[in-house]
């Protein structure tokens, strides 16, 4: 926290120490109307060049990313007279109020995996108020002579510690140029356009919204086809038993996708993604390292049926890919020992799918959505015991209302269930209310 405060102070001091002034111009680019400030060296006030302002606004519009949990375009842009460098600071203030009833989830987010399997006085009801997903971001666009348009982006929220600790957390920090993304960003396996907005921060349990360090290359053709390939930091969660041990990973996860955009303004798309993992572990019996291969495939997409109706979906299947299915993330099922031969290790099959529909009563102002999501863990060689996770369900219905272009109110109902291998099942319900302001 001290480091964060000191960083803000340093930025302020540097900004004040530079002998320059900022001239404001209100610029309207269709529905996007930010205030553009021009920096002039030497202390002279300069109203700025309208062409430079339009160029700066276009830079931010053309590099703006939409989809699940993505912020709006910034309200304020600072640019140089030649628009070679533009900077925006913004953020989102969010307050979620929730009430669990008929069973409470042991998580600040609605995660079916965390539904308690025994009913007790502690797991019947719960009320929460949470602002930890409020976030700040900084985005710079540099028009480089050698690299073309360069985007530098970083954002943070306050989910860095235990629930309600409000410790700052780095969400993303990356640079982009010539199709390359280098740094920390949302995993390439996640299709940001394949899930509707939810009040619940995590979203459908079969989705895969997660951050990771990576080197990625994306390419999009004018005909709507696109592809991407990435190497991402591996993270393995396993149950090793007495004959195996964890070791540091040696090979990044390899992820690739192909995508086709179609329909009105190419608002619809279908994407096929794949991930391959070479996961290292140590064989204590043989005294040497070995590997197990994890893999996964996913079909995802968004279809704009009409301006009034949108459909969303994704389906994933694979082995050893807990990092890429939200309900299983962090669970020890990437690699497990074989109970029929404890000298062997194995990966477990797992899958998830979700589908949702959104009805735009007043497009971009008032809409309602509902969806169903399910995750399953498969058996292999009798590894899973009766009390271990087998299946999780996630059902939601919500309504969003934009009181103004920047202020949003939302109401949501969630139902979730967990079933273990012994077919014992438990469920939970949650009501969410959200107020959110983008700035």
List where the protein language model places each region.
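N-terminal periplasmic/intermembrane-space "pro-region" immediately following the signal or transit peptide
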Residues: 6, 13, 20-101
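Outer-membrane beta-barrel "beta-signal"
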Residues: 26, 427-439
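Outer membrane beta-barrel
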Residues: 80-109, 121-237, 255, 259-261, ...
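Residues that define the transmembrane beta-barrel architecture of outer-membrane proteins
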Residues: 85, 125-134, 167-171, 176, ...
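Outer-membrane beta-barrel translocator domains and adjoining extracellular loop/strand segments
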Residues: 103-108, 163-170, 193-200, 238-246, ...
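Repeated loop/turn-to-beta-strand initiation elements of outer-membrane beta-barrel proteins
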Residues: 146-147, 179-186, 223-227, 265-270, ...
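Transmembrane beta-strand segments that form the barrel wall of outer-membrane beta-barrel proteins
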Residues: 149-160, 227-233, 273-278, 367-380, ...
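Detector for outer-membrane/organellar transmembrane beta-barrel domains
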Residues: 261-384, 389
């Amino acid at each position: 926290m001290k480091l964060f405060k000191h960083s803000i102070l340093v930025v302020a001091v540097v900004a004040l120490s530079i002998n320059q002034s900022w001239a404001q111009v209100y610029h309207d680019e269709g529905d996007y109307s930010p205030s553009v400030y021009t920096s002039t060296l030497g202390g002279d006030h300069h109203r700025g060049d309208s062409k430079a302002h339009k160029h700066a606004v276009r830079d931010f519009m053309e590099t703006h990313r939409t989809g699940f949990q993505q912020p709006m375009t910034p309200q304020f842009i600072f640019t140089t007279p030649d628009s070679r460098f533009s900077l925006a600071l913004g953020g989102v203030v969010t307050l979620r109020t929730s009430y669990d009833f008929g069973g409470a989830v042991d998580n600040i987010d609605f995660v079916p995996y965390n539904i308690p399997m025994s009913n007790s006085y502690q797991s019947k009801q719960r009320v929460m108020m949470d602002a930890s997903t409020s976030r700040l971001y900084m985005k710079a666009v540099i028009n480089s002579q050698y690299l073309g348009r360069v985007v530098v982006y970083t954002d943070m929220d306050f989910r860095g510690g235990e629930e309600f600790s409000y410790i700052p957390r780095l969400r993303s920090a990356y640079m982009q140029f010539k199709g390359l993304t280098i740094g920390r960003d949302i995993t390439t396996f996640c299709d940001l356009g394949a899930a509707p907005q939810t009040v619940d921060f995590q979203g459908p349990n079969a989705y895969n919204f997660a951050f990771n360090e990576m080197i990625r290359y994306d390419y999009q053709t004018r005909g709507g086809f696109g592809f991407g390939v990435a190497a991402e930091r591996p993270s393995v969660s396993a149950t090793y038993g007495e004959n195996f041990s964890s070791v540091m990973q040696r090979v990044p996860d390899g992820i690739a996708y192909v995508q086709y955009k179609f329909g009105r303004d190419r608002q619809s798309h279908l994407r096929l993604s794949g991930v391959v993992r070479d996961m290292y572990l140590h064989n204590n019996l043989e005294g040497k390292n070995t590997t197990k291969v994890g893999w996964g495939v996913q079909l995802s997409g968004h279809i704009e049926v009409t301006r009034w109706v949108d459909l969303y979906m994704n389906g994933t299947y694979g082995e050893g890919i807990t990092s890429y299915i939200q309900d299983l993330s962090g669970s020890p099922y990437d690699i497990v020992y074989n109970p029929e031969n404890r000298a062997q290790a194995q990966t477990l099959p797992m899958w998830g799918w979700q589908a949702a529909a959104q009805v735009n009563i007043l497009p971009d102002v008032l809409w309602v959505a509902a969806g169903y999501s399910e995750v399953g863990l498969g058996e292999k060689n009798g590894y899973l015991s009766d009390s271990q996770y087998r299946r999780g369900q996630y059902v939601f219905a919500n309504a969003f209302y934009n009181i103004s272009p920047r202020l949003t109110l939302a109401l949501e109902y969630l139902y979730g269930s967990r079933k273990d291998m012994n077919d014992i099942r438990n469920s939970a319900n949650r009501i969410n209310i959200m107020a959110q302001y983008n700035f």
